Amino acid sequence: MPREVSWPMWAMFITATYALAGWSAYSCATSFDDPLSALFMASSGVHFVIWGNFLIVHYCLFVWAIIRVLFGQLTAIEYDHIFERLHVVLVTLASIVITMRKTYMAGHMTILFYTLCLVAHWVLRDRMDFVFQVHGTDSSLLGILCSRFMFSLLVLGMVDYKMLKFCVQNTNVDGKRHDLYLMLALSFAQLILDVLHVVLLTSLNLFEMVRSRRTRSANLVYEGGTTDDDADDEVFILEGKYIYETVFDLTITVLKVILDIIQEVFVPWSITVVYSIFVRSIKAGESFLLVYNYWKNNKKLYEKLSDVSEEQLDDTDSMCIICMDDMLPTTETTKMNRRAKMLPCGHMLHFGCLKSWMERSQTCPICRLSVFANDSNSHATTQAREQTPPDLLQERGIDEHIDVIGMQDMSVQSISLHEGTAVRRGTTGNCMNQAYDGGLLSHEERDQAGWVAFPIEFRADNKVFFNLNDSQGDRQWMASYTSYPRQNMVNSDDPDNASESHSRIPSPSLPGSLEGTSSQVDVTVSAKDAPANACFVIATSKLEQTKEVEHLKRKVEELESRVEELSKRIKTDQV
């Protein structure tokens, strides 16, 4: 029983039910000598409520006994899923019984049996996940094939087929169509589809389990029979498993929608059927888009992402955030799935882990930036050049600025993209201009300067997009800067008054801890001294802080995932 309802409470409720039923039977029998009159009294008033409760309690006990025989002790998750879905089914079946009151009693009994089968199918789906998650690859193939789960799967499949055949035979009797049996036939057909879905998922899990055992045996032979190496513990992960599961679910959902449409055509109109068609159609559309995006974006995923060098791994945390295992350079691993790949946002993952993640989401698991941002940037660059000319921004009173942020002895430099005027303060401007003229400095020059320059890529929707490059490697981030309405504009024709008319400029939008603070500027530089390609400048000490913060974030995410896993195990073990 679920945690909220203990056995003593159930025992007290059942005892009270029997006591009230005994009192009702005694009262009706002593009130009338005629059995028909006593039966009529039992079916009216408070006696009807008592006997209705008596029948419901015994039906629930019967359902519980059948479920216990098929599946044994239920887990807390299975109980939760039953009570989450049961109220909707009861309302639907009650509406069917009320609208079809003239149907034979056999039809109503079939509805009760259908409810029992429906609950058993819910438990069957959850039990499949429980069997393969708890036992994993440690169970033998013969043990799973001879388990109670496979027995329940076989029994429910046979029962669904027999009930479908029975309902089809009673749909048209003596030339008269019975809509209730037609509806039940379509409902049992959907239960057969559920059994087929479980069979497909079970076959997929069994295939993965067999391949995993073979991979482990091959690793043991290759490593000389030891069990201490990481390669010995490596399990086979079926590539594209989630996509296969999504395709199975999409196929079953489409077939169920077709059955619902048939039911809506031949059976009197029902709002529950329309709701089912609507919800399942949305679910099928989402599954189709997921499969399509995965097929479109992942065809050349390996070539699109750059390899990670040993220097880059040394400069950052080399732990994969998905599998929590250390990443190795490309030269030290022969397996493609174990190679480290760098995303456009600069985060690094195992290629195999990335493919598994991409089956569920097309974004980075750490910063949620799109993995294919570079492909969209090239299109956005062309579109921005065509749609946001400088004259249009001038008319709307929009001014785009970039703050060059320095640390300690570094100064702040503000550049107006459209006015052609640059303003600076301090004694390090020559070093900055050298970086602007030559793009990014070399690693040695950047180490001496103590800062990193970031060139602007493009503009779109009043935003400036640019890449942030690590001074110690090729790691990159994508950042954006949003333009704001012009306050005190710097007049490019009169640069002498620039320092008097400038205002404090908002900081660019940087990811995480890279966001800096701007300050006011004092010295004006003419337009000819302004750099051709504007850049952001930030101290390398900021990047070191970012690495520490990212490392702490990964540790926190690891702890959260472990806590969530332990919570699921505790919830599964509780009854």
Swiss-Prot record:
Gene coding for it: HRD1
GO molecular function: ubiquitin protein ligase activity; zinc ion binding
Protein known as: ERAD-associated E3 ubiquitin-protein ligase HRD1
Topology within the bilayer: Multi-pass membrane protein
Top-level lineage group: Eukaryota
Pfam family, one: zf-RING_2
Keywords associated with the record: Endoplasmic reticulum, Membrane, Metal-binding, Transferase, Transmembrane, Transmembrane helix, Ubl conjugation pathway, Zinc, Zinc-finger
ZnF RING-type: positions: 320-368
Lumenal side: 26-46, 101-103, 160-179
Subunit structure as annotated in this protein's UniProt entry: Interacts with HRD3.
InterPro entries: HRD1_E3_ubiq-ligases, Znf_RING, Znf_RING/FYVE/PHD
SUPFAM superfamilies: RING/U-box
Enzyme class at the top of the EC tree: transferase
